[in-house]
């Protein structure tokens, strides 16, 4: 498998960060074509002798997009329509990428990837703990949002004979009440 990165912003480049597949794993004339993925970001480029410095969010972005890349590159499926990230439902396609984000808040991992730009020293444990605490602040509300999305999905797909306004009924129920709309 192959993996390429284009990390820095430049004129004419669209914003955001993403992983894209250049080549998917498939069988061609009896031989396996190995997958190739590329990761594109828009981080601040190095200036002169000063390196590009990444925020915690930037590092999470790299790990997240690399999770998509791993999903694509490690596939064993040779049927093009379902190889790598192709044909994977949107909620499932995020699993490997969100899993990879967890490594950013792992002390052992952070010790290997963080170094002070001038001294070369690794991040102090106290600073790491503060970053984790800040990251986790309000995490309960993010979980509530995910539960709301899951509940919406369940309620929508449980209805075998939906009415014209089923979506609106479910949304109104989730937004303004707590009991099930059924």
Task: Label each region the model flagged.
Residues 57-72:
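Active-site recognition of the HExxH zinc-binding catalytic motif
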Residues 48-59, 82-89:
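Alpha-helix N-cap/helix-initiation motif
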Residues 176-181:
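Conserved small/polar residues in nucleotide/adenosyl-binding loops
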Residues 1-54:
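Active-site-adjacent "gating/activation" loops or surface patches in catalytic cores
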Residues 142, 146-171:
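A glycine-rich beta-turn/hairpin centered on an aromatic-Pro dipeptide
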Residues 9-11, 45-47, 76, 103-106, ...:
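Short loop/turn segments at secondary-structure transitions that flank enzyme active sites
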Residues 72-150:
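Acidic/histidine-rich catalytic neighborhood
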């Amino acid at each position: 498998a192959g993996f390429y990165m284009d990390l820095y912003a430049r004129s004419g480049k669209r914003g955001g960060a993403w992983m894209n597949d250049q080549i998917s794993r498939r069988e061609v004339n009896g031989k396996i074509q190995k997958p190739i993925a590329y990761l594109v970001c828009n981080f601040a480029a190095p200036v002169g002798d000063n390196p590009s410095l990444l925020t915690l969010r930037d590092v999470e972005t790299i790990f997240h997009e690399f999770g998509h890349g791993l999903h694509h590159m490690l596939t064993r499926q040779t049927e093009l329509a379902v190889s790598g990230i192709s044909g994977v439902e949107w909620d499932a396609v995020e699993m490997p990428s969100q899993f990879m984000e967890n490594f950013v808040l792992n002390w052992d991992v952070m010790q290997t990837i963080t170094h002070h730009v001038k001294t070369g020293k690794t991040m102090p444990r106290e600073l790491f703990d503060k970053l984790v605490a800040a990251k986790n602040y309000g995490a309960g509300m993010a979980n509530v949002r995910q539960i709301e999305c899951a509940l919406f999905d369940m309620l929508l797909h449980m209805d075998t004979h939906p009415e014209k306004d089923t979506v609106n009924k479910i949304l109104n129920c989730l937004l303004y009440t707590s009991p099930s709309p059924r």
